[in-house]
Amino acid sequence: MERHNRELVRTRNYIRKKRRKSDFERAVSGSFAIFYEQAQEAAGGLKAQIEQDGEPENYLCHGDLNQHHILLAEENEMAVIEFNRMHRGVQVEDLYHFTRKILEKHGWDLRLGMRLLETYDRILPLNAQERIYLYYLFLYPEKYWKQLNFYYNAGKAWIPVRSIEKLQKLEEQQTARNLFLEAIR
């Protein structure tokens, strides 16, 4: 998260120096403070939690779990596919990736998010340390960072309209996302 935060600042500084700003750059300038504050809180909170409780236990993780990597078969059987990012890590990171992708697609629907987490907790109960870790993962504005990072590392002569739309959608979903964050805190 610290590296991502440095990348956010680098992109903001680049945009600040530009005289003529595109719609995307103006959108970033208008929303940066809110998302960067969350990014700092997430990084600081996670670091403090690890200093206090130590590193969470590591397990094998999928590394990129989302709805595209789960196959449903007959009779309620499931299979997880594409383990090319598998690694040893904190298991709730897989839960975070899966849940975040689903919630982004469903406008951060609080009931859906809580049902997903409660169902997971029934099968594999989360301890207090994992819950805190999960909260800070959700707090970090990963999608915002992805958009800014894509912008910074791409050619800036032409910025896709889709990038502006994605930023606007993030801003529109912020209230619902904050409600979800309050519920899991």
Which sequence ranges carry the predicted segments?
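ATP-dependent phospho-/nucleotidyl transfer catalytic cores
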Residues: M1-L60, R115
